[in-house]
Curated annotation (Swiss-Prot):
The basal body constitutes a major portion of the flagellar organelle and consists of five rings (E,L,P,S, and M) mounted on a central rod. The rod consists of about 26 subunits of FlgG in the distal portion, and FlgB, FlgC and FlgF are thought to build up the proximal portion of the rod with about 6 subunits each. The gene is flgF. SUPFAM superfamilies: Flagellar hook protein flgE (SSF117143). Belongs to the flagella basal body rod proteins family. This is Flagellar basal-body rod protein FlgF. GO terms for biological process: bacterial-type flagellum-dependent swarming motility. It comes from the Bacteria. Keywords: Bacterial flagellum. InterPro entries: Flag_bb_rod_N, Flagellar_basal_body_rod_CS, Flagellar_FlgE/F/G, Flg_bb/hook_C_dom, FlgE/F/G-like, LlgE_F_G-like_D1. One of its GO terms (cellular component) is bacterial-type flagellum basal body. The keyword Glycoprotein does not apply.
Length: 249
Protein backbone atom coordinates (compact mmCIF):
# COMPACT_ATOMS: atom_id res chain seq x y z
CA UNK A 1 0.00 0.00 0.00
CA UNK A 2 1.20 3.51 -0.79
CA UNK A 3 2.66 4.97 2.41
CA UNK A 4 0.86 8.32 2.04
CA UNK A 5 -2.47 6.55 1.44
CA UNK A 6 -1.96 4.32 4.48
CA UNK A 7 -1.09 7.21 6.79
CA UNK A 8 -4.03 9.32 5.58
CA UNK A 9 -6.44 6.39 5.80
CA UNK A 10 -5.25 5.49 9.29
CA UNK A 11 -5.59 9.13 10.39
CA UNK A 12 -9.10 9.29 8.92
CA UNK A 13 -10.17 6.15 10.81
CA UNK A 14 -8.89 7.62 14.07
CA UNK A 15 -10.70 10.88 13.39
CA UNK A 16 -13.95 8.96 12.92
CA UNK A 17 -13.35 7.32 16.31
CA UNK A 18 -12.79 10.75 17.82
CA UNK A 19 -16.00 12.03 16.25
CA UNK A 20 -17.95 9.12 17.74
CA UNK A 21 -16.62 9.93 21.21
CA UNK A 22 -17.40 13.64 20.82
CA UNK A 23 -20.90 12.87 19.52
CA UNK A 24 -21.50 10.70 22.60
CA UNK A 25 -20.28 13.51 24.85
CA UNK A 26 -22.62 16.02 23.22
CA UNK A 27 -25.53 13.57 23.44
CA UNK A 28 -25.00 13.39 27.21
CA UNK A 29 -24.78 17.09 28.00
CA UNK A 30 -27.97 16.77 30.06
CA UNK A 31 -27.20 13.35 31.60
CA UNK A 32 -26.77 13.64 35.37
CA UNK A 33 -23.29 12.68 36.58
CA UNK A 34 -21.97 11.95 33.07
CA UNK A 35 -18.19 12.06 32.61
CA UNK A 36 -16.91 13.11 29.22
CA UNK A 37 -14.34 10.94 27.47
CA UNK A 38 -11.70 11.56 24.84
CA UNK A 39 -9.29 9.52 22.72
CA UNK A 40 -5.55 9.98 22.64
CA UNK A 41 -3.38 8.58 19.85
CA UNK A 42 0.33 7.82 19.89
CA UNK A 43 1.95 8.22 16.48
CA UNK A 44 3.71 5.09 15.25
CA UNK A 45 5.31 4.83 11.82
CA UNK A 46 5.70 1.04 11.91
CA UNK A 47 4.00 -0.13 8.72
CA UNK A 48 4.90 -3.81 8.98
CA UNK A 49 1.86 -4.83 11.01
CA UNK A 50 -0.98 -2.42 10.23
CA UNK A 51 -3.63 -4.05 12.43
CA UNK A 52 -1.37 -4.34 15.45
CA UNK A 53 -0.15 -0.76 15.09
CA UNK A 54 -3.70 0.64 14.90
CA UNK A 55 -4.93 -1.24 17.96
CA UNK A 56 -2.02 -0.10 20.09
CA UNK A 57 -2.34 3.56 19.11
CA UNK A 58 -5.78 4.26 20.56
CA UNK A 59 -6.51 4.83 24.24
CA UNK A 60 -9.64 6.25 25.82
CA UNK A 61 -9.48 8.57 28.81
CA UNK A 62 -12.16 10.10 31.03
CA UNK A 63 -12.54 13.51 32.56
CA UNK A 64 -13.51 12.81 36.18
CA UNK A 65 -13.63 16.48 37.16
CA UNK A 66 -16.92 17.15 39.03
CA UNK A 67 -19.80 18.71 37.15
CA UNK A 68 -21.76 21.71 38.37
CA UNK A 69 -23.90 21.07 41.45
CA UNK A 70 -27.63 21.64 41.00
CA UNK A 71 -29.98 22.29 43.93
CA UNK A 72 -33.21 20.32 43.39
CA UNK A 73 -34.83 20.27 46.86
CA UNK A 74 -35.82 16.65 46.12
CA UNK A 75 -35.08 14.10 48.86
CA UNK A 76 -34.09 11.35 46.43
CA UNK A 77 -31.54 13.42 44.53
CA UNK A 78 -27.95 12.81 45.62
CA UNK A 79 -24.42 14.00 44.92
CA UNK A 80 -21.77 11.35 45.59
CA UNK A 81 -18.75 13.27 46.82
CA UNK A 82 -15.13 13.05 45.68
CA UNK A 83 -14.07 9.60 44.43
CA UNK A 84 -17.10 7.85 45.91
CA UNK A 85 -19.48 5.93 43.64
CA UNK A 86 -23.03 4.61 43.84
CA UNK A 87 -23.23 0.84 43.25
CA UNK A 88 -25.98 -0.44 40.93
CA UNK A 89 -26.89 -3.58 38.96
CA UNK A 90 -26.84 -3.53 35.17
CA UNK A 91 -29.33 -5.53 33.06
CA UNK A 92 -27.11 -8.62 33.42
CA UNK A 93 -26.99 -8.35 37.20
CA UNK A 94 -23.36 -7.23 37.16
CA UNK A 95 -22.25 -4.61 39.66
CA UNK A 96 -21.51 -1.24 38.09
CA UNK A 97 -20.92 2.29 39.34
CA UNK A 98 -22.36 5.71 38.64
CA UNK A 99 -22.24 9.34 39.75
CA UNK A 100 -25.87 9.78 38.74
CA UNK A 101 -27.82 10.27 41.96
CA UNK A 102 -31.27 10.92 40.45
CA UNK A 103 -33.06 8.11 42.29
CA UNK A 104 -36.56 6.89 41.52
CA UNK A 105 -38.73 4.18 43.08
CA UNK A 106 -40.36 1.71 40.69
CA UNK A 107 -43.66 -0.15 41.06
CA UNK A 108 -41.91 -2.98 42.91
CA UNK A 109 -40.58 -0.62 45.55
CA UNK A 110 -37.00 -0.84 44.29
CA UNK A 111 -34.75 2.21 44.16
CA UNK A 112 -33.40 2.80 40.66
CA UNK A 113 -31.19 5.15 38.65
CA UNK A 114 -31.91 5.22 34.90
CA UNK A 115 -33.96 2.03 35.47
CA UNK A 116 -30.95 0.23 36.99
CA UNK A 117 -31.55 -1.18 40.48
CA UNK A 118 -29.48 0.25 43.31
CA UNK A 119 -27.48 -2.21 45.41
CA UNK A 120 -28.05 -2.14 49.14
CA UNK A 121 -25.25 -2.38 51.65
CA UNK A 122 -27.05 -5.25 53.41
CA UNK A 123 -29.03 -6.82 50.57
CA UNK A 124 -31.93 -5.61 48.45
CA UNK A 125 -33.69 -2.38 49.36
CA UNK A 126 -37.50 -2.50 49.54
CA UNK A 127 -39.33 0.80 49.94
CA UNK A 128 -42.88 0.65 51.39
CA UNK A 129 -45.66 2.52 49.62
CA UNK A 130 -46.50 6.11 50.47
CA UNK A 131 -43.65 6.90 52.84
CA UNK A 132 -41.57 10.00 53.38
CA UNK A 133 -37.90 9.20 52.89
CA UNK A 134 -34.65 10.74 54.02
CA UNK A 135 -31.19 9.63 52.91
CA UNK A 136 -28.44 10.50 55.37
CA UNK A 137 -24.99 11.65 54.35
CA UNK A 138 -23.64 8.10 54.92
CA UNK A 139 -26.25 6.50 52.63
CA UNK A 140 -28.66 5.24 55.29
CA UNK A 141 -32.29 5.34 54.09
CA UNK A 142 -34.84 6.35 56.71
CA UNK A 143 -38.61 6.58 56.84
CA UNK A 144 -39.85 9.80 58.41
CA UNK A 145 -43.09 9.82 60.41
CA UNK A 146 -44.39 13.03 61.86
CA UNK A 147 -46.53 13.02 64.97
CA UNK A 148 -48.04 16.00 66.69
CA UNK A 149 -45.15 16.45 69.07
CA UNK A 150 -42.25 14.57 67.47
CA UNK A 151 -40.62 13.16 64.36
CA UNK A 152 -39.88 9.43 64.31
CA UNK A 153 -37.14 8.05 62.04
CA UNK A 154 -36.85 4.33 61.25
CA UNK A 155 -34.13 2.75 59.10
CA UNK A 156 -35.23 0.95 55.93
CA UNK A 157 -31.83 0.11 54.48
CA UNK A 158 -28.57 1.55 53.26
CA UNK A 159 -27.10 2.36 49.85
CA UNK A 160 -23.89 0.64 48.83
CA UNK A 161 -21.29 3.36 48.42
CA UNK A 162 -17.78 2.49 47.25
CA UNK A 163 -14.52 4.35 46.87
CA UNK A 164 -12.51 3.58 43.73
CA UNK A 165 -9.48 5.03 42.01
CA UNK A 166 -10.37 6.55 38.66
CA UNK A 167 -7.56 4.67 36.90
CA UNK A 168 -9.25 1.36 37.76
CA UNK A 169 -12.48 2.20 35.93
CA UNK A 170 -13.71 1.86 32.37
CA UNK A 171 -16.98 3.16 30.92
CA UNK A 172 -19.13 0.93 28.72
CA UNK A 173 -21.74 1.78 26.08
CA UNK A 174 -24.54 1.91 28.66
CA UNK A 175 -22.79 4.87 30.31
CA UNK A 176 -21.99 2.95 33.50
CA UNK A 177 -18.51 2.47 34.91
CA UNK A 178 -16.99 -0.93 35.63
CA UNK A 179 -13.71 -2.21 37.00
CA UNK A 180 -11.14 -2.87 34.31
CA UNK A 181 -10.53 -6.57 33.65
CA UNK A 182 -7.05 -6.51 35.14
CA UNK A 183 -8.51 -5.18 38.41
CA UNK A 184 -11.38 -7.66 38.77
CA UNK A 185 -9.36 -10.16 40.80
CA UNK A 186 -7.76 -7.47 42.96
CA UNK A 187 -11.15 -5.93 43.79
CA UNK A 188 -13.34 -9.02 43.43
CA UNK A 189 -15.57 -8.20 46.38
CA UNK A 190 -15.83 -4.45 46.75
CA UNK A 191 -17.31 -3.64 50.11
CA UNK A 192 -19.34 -0.65 51.20
CA UNK A 193 -17.11 2.21 52.29
CA UNK A 194 -18.60 3.97 55.28
CA UNK A 195 -16.32 6.98 54.75
CA UNK A 196 -18.00 7.93 51.45
CA UNK A 197 -20.35 10.87 51.85
CA UNK A 198 -23.33 12.05 49.85
CA UNK A 199 -25.30 15.29 49.73
CA UNK A 200 -29.06 15.03 49.33
CA UNK A 201 -31.38 17.42 47.47
CA UNK A 202 -28.64 18.07 44.92
CA UNK A 203 -27.43 16.58 41.64
CA UNK A 204 -24.10 16.69 39.83
CA UNK A 205 -24.56 17.85 36.25
CA UNK A 206 -22.69 16.42 33.28
CA UNK A 207 -19.13 17.75 33.05
CA UNK A 208 -19.19 17.92 29.24
CA UNK A 209 -17.92 21.23 27.87
CA UNK A 210 -20.20 21.75 24.83
CA UNK A 211 -18.16 24.61 23.34
CA UNK A 212 -14.89 22.67 23.42
CA UNK A 213 -16.51 19.53 22.03
CA UNK A 214 -18.15 21.45 19.17
CA UNK A 215 -14.83 23.11 18.28
CA UNK A 216 -13.09 19.71 18.35
CA UNK A 217 -15.82 18.22 16.15
CA UNK A 218 -15.41 20.95 13.52
CA UNK A 219 -11.62 20.62 13.63
CA UNK A 220 -11.81 16.84 13.22
CA UNK A 221 -14.21 17.20 10.28
CA UNK A 222 -11.76 19.52 8.51
CA UNK A 223 -8.85 17.16 9.15
CA UNK A 224 -10.92 14.22 7.89
CA UNK A 225 -11.73 16.10 4.68
CA UNK A 226 -8.05 16.93 4.20
CA UNK A 227 -7.07 13.26 4.56
CA UNK A 228 -9.74 12.23 2.06
CA UNK A 229 -8.31 14.73 -0.44
CA UNK A 230 -4.81 13.33 0.06
CA UNK A 231 -6.07 9.79 -0.58
CA UNK A 232 -7.88 10.96 -3.70
CA UNK A 233 -4.77 12.77 -4.98
CA UNK A 234 -2.60 9.71 -4.37
CA UNK A 235 -5.08 7.53 -6.25
CA UNK A 236 -5.05 9.95 -9.18
CA UNK A 237 -1.24 10.07 -9.21
CA UNK A 238 -1.08 6.28 -9.18
CA UNK A 239 -3.55 6.13 -12.06
CA UNK A 240 -1.54 8.68 -14.09
CA UNK A 241 1.67 6.77 -13.42
CA UNK A 242 0.08 3.53 -14.62
CA UNK A 243 -1.16 5.24 -17.78
CA UNK A 244 2.31 6.60 -18.54
CA UNK A 245 3.83 3.20 -17.91
CA UNK A 246 1.38 1.57 -20.32
CA UNK A 247 2.06 4.20 -23.00
CA UNK A 248 5.82 3.74 -22.74
CA UNK A 249 5.41 0.01 -23.12
Amino acid sequence: MNKAIYESMNAAIKLLDKQAVIANNLANISTVGFKESFNLFIKDRNLQNLKKTYNQNVKEYYNFYPGTLIHTQRNLDLVIKNNGWLAIKDINGQEAYTKNGHIKINKEGKMTVQNYELIGNNGNIKIPNNVNLKISSNGIIKEIKKNKDSIIESTIGSLKLVRLQNDNLIQKENGLFYLKKDNLNKYKNILHDSSVRIQSEMLEASNVNPTKNMIDMISNARQFEMNMKIISMCDQNTEYANQLFNVNN
